[in-house]
From Swiss-Prot:
Enzyme class: transferase
Cofactor(s) the protein requires to work: Mg(2+)
Active site annotation, chain numbering: 104
HAMAP family associated with the record: DNApol_IV
Organism, scientific name: Shewanella baltica (strain OS155 / ATCC BAA-1091)
Record: residues binding Mg(2+): 8, 103
TM region positions: none
GO MF entry, a single one: magnesium ion binding
Gene: dinB
Keywords assigned: Cytoplasm, DNA damage, DNA repair, DNA replication, DNA-binding, DNA-directed DNA polymerase, Magnesium, Metal-binding, Mutator protein, Nucleotidyltransferase, Transferase
Domain of life per record: Bacteria
Subcellular location: Cytoplasm
Name of the protein in question: DNA polymerase IV
Amino acid sequence: MRKIIHIDMDCYFAAVEMRDFPEYRGKPLAVGGSSDRRGVISTCSYEARKFGVRSAMATAYAFKLCPDLILVPGRMQVYKDVSLQIREIFSRYTQLVEPLSLDEAYLDVSECQQYKGSATLIAQAIRRDILAETGLTASAGIAPVKFLAKVASDLNKPNGQYVITPETLPEFVKTLSLRKIPGVGKVTAEKLSSLGLNTCGDVQAYSKPELLARFGKFGGVLIERSQGIDERGISADRERKSVGVETTLAKDIYSLEQCQQVMPGLIQELALRLSRSAKERKIHKQVVKLKFNDFKQTTIEHRSDEVSIVMFYDLLAQAMARQEGRGIRLLGISVGLADSILAVSEIPNAQTQLDLAL
């Protein structure tokens, strides 16, 4: 049986700010963009969360919930540097580390001999090292499988940990909400609920052939996860799946022509990001995303192994057909990256294609 730890830093960006600027401690603090420029909250302190402030919330709305909110701009390089410190700590215990973002990661400690191989004690040691060396707290989840380790890391926050053992796993998953399963979003959850399926226990008792008939391949995944089965390993060499860029607009715009004026800057920035992080990766799709002023969003994608600037504009026009009179507050473009890395001589890479097009 594997021993998986999910480490999740507590309100990471905000915690770094409170560490470096003690005057923010104990106060409602948020890191994000300004309210007069359509900014959003990246993360916030637990004091701010008591007022209902949350990540990805519009900054203007956050101030309505918490008028005394302290808003600071992000210092991304600082957060990256601290994240590297944390990853160095991980490497003392295992090389099987799968970073999910700057502030969370999966670790497989199945072969770790420290602390007599106890994943519980290893997680405690990692959290202790992080606190001693960075001044920041982390929470941890320990389980035999990945998705349950992630669920567990959220159960004793902040600065705590929760263990799901092979013995307690069957009872734990029975009462687990299906919303906790990766891939079950709001729409899928509503479909499942209409069938009387709200917990993993409900799925366990439901007809498997009917689930497969209704949900196809995902039905099979749902059946496995509801039994606590997750065979996915730790991707220590995990490659990014996409590169994108988006902009939140200072004011809502309403016409296709206005959106088209935003595109050249996005395309240039995308080319720059590709040159930095995916120089020789082959693409497999292009995507355009719009977020409307009612905070709903739509995405249009086109599968292709070549970047086409014209296609980005075509996808934009298709997305605008879903506007229904709403204002546009965010516009983004991205490319999906294929798993294989081919030599430049075999196929023009995405960044080169964009340079040629520009």
